[in-house]
Swiss-Prot record:
The keyword Ribosomal protein applies. Belongs to the bacterial ribosomal protein bS16 family. One of its GO terms (biological process) is translation. This is Small ribosomal subunit protein bS16. It comes from the Bacteria. GO terms for cellular component: cytoplasm; small ribosomal subunit. The gene is rpsP. InterPro entries: Ribosomal_bS16, Ribosomal_bS16_CS, Ribosomal_bS16_dom_sf. Transmembrane segments: none annotated.
């Protein structure tokens, strides 16, 4: 099953997440199909907290990809900010 989920990056105590489309059988930080954005929960000042390619997310959801709970909330926030 294809899922849209977070893949952790960054340093210790400084998380940074790539929002990726991946097969659910692959490891969290393992192989992915496509990177559709990022989420930086530790952003400061003018740094971007969230960037998401909503067109690609819509494409993957239309083809049957499931979203994780956290990514679903991030998509909702991105849509609200874009409107």
């Amino acid at each position: 099953m294809v899922t849209i989920r977070l893949a952790r990056g960054g340093a210790k105590k400084r998380p940074f997440y790539n929002i990726v489309v991946a097969d659910s059988r692959n490891a969290r930080d393992g192989r992915f199909i496509e990177r559709v954005g990022f989420f930086n929960p530790m952003a400061r000042g003018q740094e971007e907290t969230l960037r998401l390619d909503l067109a690609r997310v819509e494409h993957w959801v239309a083809t049957g990809a499931a979203t994780s709970d956290r990514v679903a909330k991030l998509i909702k926030d991105a849509r609200k900010a874009a409107a």
